[in-house]
């Protein structure tokens, strides 16, 4: 590759990167180009569509090189617990270590996935905001249907509390108390709580974490 430069193909569209080489030009959308650098993004809600794309990207990057780290950038208000757990389980299942970085805002399942990164490799930028709370669900139908859904929400709450406790080093009782209502934190407060390992001011701060330089 001799050179690359960004060009916006249209207002509101994803930028395209044009790479020039001896073989000519090749165009990539910016996210596909960054995927080649083993960078995966979650931007927006956690849902079936975003989860299927992220799971596929993680599996693809593992097949490309099972020994090289993957970087997962998160700016998400959360969303579906089930779809979030699909991403979480895949992160733990694959061989490459996955580092996580919060840019902007991580809440609910977004925060859960932030904590799911490899220990020592979970980061937030200094002005990121991070929020934890208990899962919620709306129930409709007969009384029996509502009861079934309520039991499922309680199961998910207990399961997620246990997993969050394991990822943060906090007790299950602490997690249950602190997630009873929306609980917003600064990046530094999230570090103190155990949701992330470091708050990064600049890329140079990654000097102690060379895995993000090794692409």
From Swiss-Prot:
List of catalytic residues: 108, 133
Localisation: Cytoplasm
Alphabetically ordered keywords of this record: Cytoplasm, Hydrolase, Protease, Serine protease
Database matches in Pfam families: CLP_protease
Predominant location category: cytoplasm
Any GO BP annotation: protein quality control for misfolded or incompletely synthesized proteins
InterPro entries, per database record: ClpP, ClpP/crotonase-like_dom_sf, ClpP/TepA, ClpP_His_AS
GO cellular component annotations of the record: cytoplasm; endopeptidase Clp complex
E.C. numbers: 3.4.21.92
PROSITE patterns found in the cross-reference section: CLP_PROTEASE_HIS
Catalyzed reactions per annotation: Hydrolysis of proteins to small peptides in the presence of ATP and magnesium. alpha-casein is the usual test substrate. In the absence of ATP, only oligopeptides shorter than five residues are hydrolyzed (such as succinyl-Leu-Tyr-|-NHMec, and Leu-Tyr-Leu-|-Tyr-Trp, in which cleavage of the -Tyr-|-Leu- and -Tyr-|-Trp bonds also occurs)
One function term, GO molecular function aspect: ATP-dependent peptidase activity
Known role: Cleaves peptides in various proteins in a process that requires ATP hydrolysis. Has a chymotrypsin-like activity. Plays a major role in the degradation of misfolded proteins.
Sequence similarity: Belongs to the peptidase S14 family.
Subunit note: Fourteen ClpP subunits assemble into 2 heptameric rings which stack back to back to give a disk-like structure with a central cavity, resembling the structure of eukaryotic proteasomes.
HAMAP family listed in its UniProt record: ClpP (MF_00444)
NCBIfam families: clpP (TIGR00493), PRK00277.1 (NF001368), PRK12553.1 (NF009205)
Protein name: ATP-dependent Clp protease proteolytic subunit 1
Biological source species: Paraburkholderia xenovorans (strain LB400)
Source organism phylogeny: Bacteria, Pseudomonadati, Pseudomonadota, Betaproteobacteria, Burkholderiales
């Amino acid at each position: 590759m001799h050179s690359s430069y960004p060009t916006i193909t249209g207002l509101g569209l994803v930028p395209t990167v044009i790479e020039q080489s001896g073989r000519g030009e090749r165009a990539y959308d910016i996210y596909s180009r960054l995927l080649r650098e083993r960078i995966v993004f979650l931007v927006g809600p956690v849902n079936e569509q975003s989860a299927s794309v992220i799971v596929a990207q993680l599996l693809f990057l593992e097949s490309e090189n099972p020994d090289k780290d993957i970087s997962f950038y998160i700016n998400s208000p959360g969303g579906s617990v089930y779809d979030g757990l699909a991403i979480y389980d895949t992160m733990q299942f694959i061989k490459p270590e996955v580092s996580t970085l919060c840019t902007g805002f991580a809440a609910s399942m977004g925060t859960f996935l932030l904590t799911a990164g490899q220990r020592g490799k979970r980061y937030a930028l200094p002005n990121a905001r991070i929020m934890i709370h208990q899962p919620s669900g709306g129930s409709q139908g007969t009384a029996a249907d509502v009861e079934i859904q309520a039991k499922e929400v309680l199961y998910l709450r207990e399961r997620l509390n246990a997993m969050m406790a394991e990822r943060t080093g906090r007790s299950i009782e602490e997690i249950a108390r602190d997630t009873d209502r929306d609980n917003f934190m600064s990046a530094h407060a999230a570090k103190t709580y155990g949701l992330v390992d470091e708050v990064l001011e600049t890329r140079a701060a990654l000097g102690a974490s060379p895995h993000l330089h090794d692409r």
